[in-house]
Every structure is written in C-alpha cells, then in structure tokens.
Amino acid sequence: MRSTFIIFGGIGVARERDLWRNGCIDWNDLPESGISMSPRLRREVEEAENAFKNMDAVYFASRLRPAERWRLLFDFENSCAFVDIEMDGYGKYANPAVVGICRNNSYSYLLKGKDLNRQNIADKLGDSKILVFYNGARHDLRFLKRLFPDIGDRYAAVDLLPIANQLGLKGGLKKIERELCIKRSRIVELSVSGRAVQLWKSWTRTGRRAFLNMLTLYNSEDTCNLYPISMKLRDMMRSGYMEGY
C-alpha cells in the first residue's frame, strides 16, 4: 500500500508511474519528489498513515476503484476471507442457502435454516479485514446484505471480476480458473455445474445428505479457489504496472 499514490487526490496512474520512475516509492518520499505538498495532500497522507497503522482496509478500499483493489492483497493477504454463496432459487427473490468461507486455508459453511445468520457470519469471518469474491459486487455481497446489513461498513470488499477484466480475462469463475490453470475436481464440476439450486431443493425436499454433501463440496471449490485466483491476478497486475514503469 505504501507505494500506492492514486489514493491521493490529483494523482492518477500515469502520475504514480512518474513518481516511481523518479524513485518515489513510499509516502515518506513525497516531500522530496517535486510534487506540491498542498495542505490537502498533507492531510490525506496523514490520514493514510493513520489508516495503515490501524490496518484499516475499509479506508483504503474507499480510496481505490474496484479494479485497483488488487493492491490491498499485499499488506492484507493474511487478513482476507474468501466468500462464495449458493442460492435457494433464481432471481431477485432468491436468498442465500449456503455461505462458504475460506480463511487460512480452512473452509467452513453456514446453512439456511440451520446456522445462517448475521452473528454466525461475523464469527466465521473472525478478525478478517477483507472479503474476496468473484462478481461479489453484483451477486454475493448484495444478497449477504440481507442477512448482514452493515457488512460493507465492517469489511473491505475485493471483487476479482473487474481485476480480471482489466487484464483482459472475461467470463465466469470457471472460465477464469481455466485461463489461470487452476484445477478443480472434474467429477464435482460435471455433477454439479448449473445444478446448485436443484441440489439445494433436493436436499430440503428429501433430507438426503448426499445432495448437501455434493453442494457443499462444489461450494468449497468455488470458495477456496478464490485464493490462488486472487494471488495470480494480483501478481499479474503488479507485473503489468512494473512493465509500464
């Protein structure tokens, strides 16, 4: 984060690269960079210093466009929770049925009608500071807010979709996985792909554990694969910026 200058007013990506070329690679270097240290800029740098000291990911996310939030994945890598949800139906009236959370390489899930509520989501997220999704802004986060209305105030959100798009990678999660050579169980993919809602309905109708097991196994791969995807996208973005630099 400390090499990021686009969080300050009046500094865009091109100006940021100029600063890097001139040896300005930390906020502390700004006074010697030749840039005008206006009262506003001094105030913003002080705010950023305080936010960094407090590891305030929400502050930094608020200062970055969604496609630039890959920068958070360096200093906050160990404070990320990777989240994916399965729905109980289709359309705007559907609700989360399974919420999968992967933290510290450990997967867990919450089920509608059993333990899926605000308090349990917060407990599972623990001391996480960042929630990482794929297409989360339009899907996961929007539906999670029905259960956890202030989730966007408590955690920063990193949506990998706009980051992938900026790299020229288009499509859904499975397509991005293939592009990045991230593998998942072929049996699970063939068994579940496009049938998650059907599996949920079969589970609630019959109570047969096999349906739930397959659904949560599918969700675990969706959820846990977000970590290697995020790291690859992060490093690709950094390499692209360094080449420009």
Regions from the language model: what does each represent?
Residues 1-77:
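N-terminal accessory regions of nucleic-acid-interacting proteins
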Residues 68-72, 86-90, 119-121:
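Catalytic micro-motifs at enzyme active sites that drive phosphoryl/nucleotidyl and oxygen chemistry
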Residues 78-88, 219:
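Two-metal-ion RNase H-like nuclease active-site motif
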Residues 84-86, 140, 159, 222:
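Acidic active-site catalytic centers that drive phospho-/nucleotidyl reactions
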Residues 90-91, 140-143, 227:
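Short catalytic/ligand-binding loop motif for oxyanion handling, primarily in non-cytosolic enzymes
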Residues 91-97:
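Short, flexible loop/turn motifs enriched in small residues
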Residues 98-193:
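Conserved DEDDh/DEDDy metal-dependent 3′-5′ exonuclease domain
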Residues 181-245:
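Acidic, Mg2+-coordinating catalytic module of metal-dependent nucleases/exonucleases
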